[in-house]
Amino acid sequence: MTDLSDVSRTAAAKPPAVPGRGPANKVRFVTAASLFDGHDASINIMRRILQSQGCEVIHLGHNRSVQEVVTAALQEDVQGIAISSYQGGHVEYFKYMIDLLREHGGEHIQVFGGGGGVIVPDEIRELQAYGVARIYSPEDGQRMGLAGMITDMAQRCDIDLTRYAPTTLDTVVAGDRRALAQLITALENGKADPELVSALHAQAKAAAVPVLGITGTGGAGKSSLTDELIRRFRLDQDDALSIAVISIDPSRRKSGGALLGDRIRMNAINHPNIFMRSLATREAGSEISQALPDVIAACKAARFDLVIVETSGIGQGDAAIVPHVDLSLYVMTPEFGAASQLEKIDMLDFADFVAINKFDRKGAQDAWRDVAKQVQRNREQWHSRAEDMPVYGTQASRFNDDGVTMLYQGLVGALGARGMSLKPGTLPNLEGRISTGQNVIVPPARSRYLAELADTVRAYHRRVVAQSKLARERQQLRAAHDMLQGAGHESAALETLASERDVSLGAVERKLLAMWPQMQQAYSGDEYVVKIRDKEIRTGLISTTLSGTKIRKVVLPRFEDEGEILKWLMRENVPGSFPYTAGVFAFKREGEDPTRMFAGEGDAFRTNRRFKLVSEGMEAKRLSTAFDSVTLYGEDPHERPDIYGKVGNSGVSIATLEDMKVLYDGFDLTNPSTSVSMTINGPAPTILAMFMNTAIDQQIDRFRADNGRDPTADEEAKIRAWVLQNVRGTVQADILKEDQGQNTCIFSTEFSLKVMGDIQEYFVHHQVRNFYSVSISGYHIAEAGANPISQLAFTLANGFTYVEAYLARGMHIDDFAPNLSFFFSNGMDPEYSVLGRVARRIWAVTMRDKYGANDRSQKLKYHIQTSGRSLHAQEIDFNDIRTTLQALIAIYDNCNSLHTNAYDEAITTPTAESVRRALAIQLIINREWGVAKCENPNQGSFLIEELTDLVEEAVLQEFERIAERGGVLGAMETGYQRGKIQEESLYYEQLKHDGTLPIIGVNTFRNPNGDPTPQTLELARSSEDEKQSQLHRLTEFHGAHQADAEAMLARLRQAVIDNRNVFAVLMDAVRVCSLGQITHALFEVGGQYRRNM
């Protein structure tokens, strides 16, 4: 446990502040998750608490390199850096950060970190000895609480940075950006020498540097647009310009804290020529900081070629930026209400340029026309056409948007007229004012698809109620008729009433009731017999206990009321029958447990050995592959410390096709009993192409071995086709979930969704029927903090979004729906007991009744992984108990495959011993646990049935909330899903911390002797030899294919530009290009992911 008496290591630290009082100085923090780490839920909570305690926070989000964090910290001149690191490589990461800070004049900046149980006590001591101010452990969290840890950080950083500011302008004028940052701090704090400020303005006046002001309403996309303009300045001028960006965000009146959130959106500023500084408005009561004139002067004195000022969001009557800039750009969206509202917008009087951003929204064309006419009226330029006004329609979220380029070229002309030195640009000149691109992932006419699906499910249940009532009444009337007739009384009227109900019963419902006696007979014997053509397939239905009791594989209800029978058949039914509530297959596959054999550590050789170990003795090889974080983010291994430390940690390092061949060596990837699951998303298309080529090359090698020669071109084509039709497995590749919760997006969302569609089209064209093109995942949404209902609702909503997107591309529902699979988390909450039941029923009903899909498409197949969030670093031996309970409910709910987490995953990559224990949990349930011999044990439980209905209705209501926001993509744009996940995560953490939610061994039933386990655990880390081997193999691969790689990358880029099938080209590209080479080539034409707050 960390020693709390270990106070700040810097001489500048102040005595602890009075508890409950904000910092005496303006404390600024940079917060981020470490490189190749998408776990940003905790750091988001931390930065919110920092803000509430009066700190100004520059939040960088997930996946940030040491260089990015240090550059931000130096330019923003902060007192502290807070980093969460859950993905391994933390020792190298934090040490590299301390080294860079010391090298670049930031030695007084204090570094704080945390990573749950991933950073073990010995490593905490090592890092703190090296210079990290504090690494917070899980024990610290329990003892201090979230707010206590943040207070500790703020107190340690409560120092006045003015002491470090330059006393002359010499270093600033000479181009020292660190000195500029420190001068800005003094100016912002109002503590700069007045004579120095006067000299500063004199220097600025002589510099004649143009200033571009960008302002607009909150949420208009100013930061994204600013970043896209900077990207075009860099491209067009070949990085010859030096640009300063001053970004202003509002301070919170109550706490004085501020979220300085523009930097997180910037992808184009990572260059030595770009300087960015975030300012809080503080006490200004305006959209600009009181220090802005001085800060602009400082940037001019520093001899930048251009200064860009971006203000915080403004109202209709605000135009405070205008006096401070030479050129102003007003950014708005099409949703401004009636055209008369435009007359109230002050900036339309003053702005030199207007951008209507988010131009893909409904009514954008009309908005552009109305704004252009208003600008024309304001300027009284009746001699010009309204469409010639400097009003542009832009889509900053769309990579390489031509509307943004048109705006950029208009700005360049105006800046040149104001004296800015520019060379002829390299970007082609574009004519026009508005973006011609339209994002049609889901057509606008289908934006309410989720609400329609909710209506479909509810309509189905209304029909169930009505039809079961008719069936009950028909049976009752017939019985009454028979009794009256038997007693010699008149019964014709009853016969008429019964006939009316018979006619009102639907054909499907009559068929279900007619087949009920046959179903009872089929399941009543010792075997279930199905005839397919002339062949009988027999399945044993009886297991006999040691006591001689016969346990049936499927147990039917004993209802005699036809209304209840029909209701059960329509809402439940036996496994394998619509609506598949109890399962999509009639029986589990004999001899194949749903066990996934999980591995991923070190290099491909070590993980291959682990696969062979965990699958030993198993007839079915169900290999589940975890990749290291370098691979997850599409990069190659590298010796740079923040990359090097993560190579082969928390997963296997795969950079080339040769690595992939080693990984699955010895496993026949086309064998029906072999399937491979690959947990990867951002670079999934490239990894999938490597896997498919590995499977193909296995069979070509087999042909050579069997025939003693190479196959002919025709034979090779047949082998390729056969392999694609027979290979079994799953790739996760779920980009929507990544954007909402997991954060391994690397490309722009639009481009990633386009390539997902390319993969599915390729699968359809090549008849890839046994491999899932996507695993639509709720697991990582749950791991990010979502409760079970949100997990299920968001996951199903994402699945239906893919359905709508693929239908919009012209694919038929039955050609692609069978390639979709799902992946859920289990946990300790009661709702987890029915996740599969609810998911299967909603999917089946909507697929049949809304989309007209066939039986195969109606079957939702899903994988379950026990909850990683429920694994705790304290009393880790208790984790297996939680995992066992979660595995039990997954098996009871008929999941199609199951992965049980190892008990030590809260701290390290699973060891051989812990993986064996995790596998044993499943084996014991499947082979020893008596009730598991029955394959529908949940059916008939009053609690399970009620939970199913409650959870289903909660999911449908969430569908409607998402539909109100324009569907999944519209909700993502406003951060709806991410915000809800974070709220639910914080709620869980609060209940865990205050003990309201009891967690055994964590906040109650604590070991009185402490918890020594983390000290003695074997930590799974990649070895130095494995890392060096990966670097060496990568160098060899690059050398062997040097002659072909660049031409192939050019072909790949051109495929994107021409809007051709990218995956088809990737199938060739992976043979000569590494993962990192492909990723960076696609960045150039597909765009990088833009992080959200």
From Swiss-Prot:
GTP binds at G219, A220, G221, K222, S223, S224, R265, N357, K358, F359, D360, E973, N1092. Residues 1-20 are annotated as: Disordered. The keyword Heme does not apply. Its EC number is 5.4.99.13, 3.6.5.-. Mg(2+) 1 binds at S223, D262, E310. Residues 26-156 form the B12-binding domain. Residues 418-579 are annotated as: Linker. One of its GO terms (biological process) is acyl-CoA metabolic process. Its cofactor is adenosylcob(III)alamin; Mg(2+). In many AdoCbl-dependent isomerases, e.g. methylmalonyl-CoA mutase (MCM), its G-protein chaperone is a separate protein. PANTHER family: LAO_AO TRANSPORT SYSTEM ATPASE, LYSINE/ARGININE/ORNITHINE TRANSPORT SYSTEM KINASE. Belongs to the IcmF family. Homodimer. Is composed of four functional domains: the N-terminal 5'-deoxyadenosylcobalamin binding region that is homologous to the small subunit of ICM (IcmB), a middle P-loop GTPase domain (MeaI) that acts as a chaperone for ICM, a structured linker region involved in dimer formation, and a C-terminal part that is homologous to the large substrate-binding subunit of ICM (IcmA). This is Fused isobutyryl-CoA mutase. The gene is icmF.
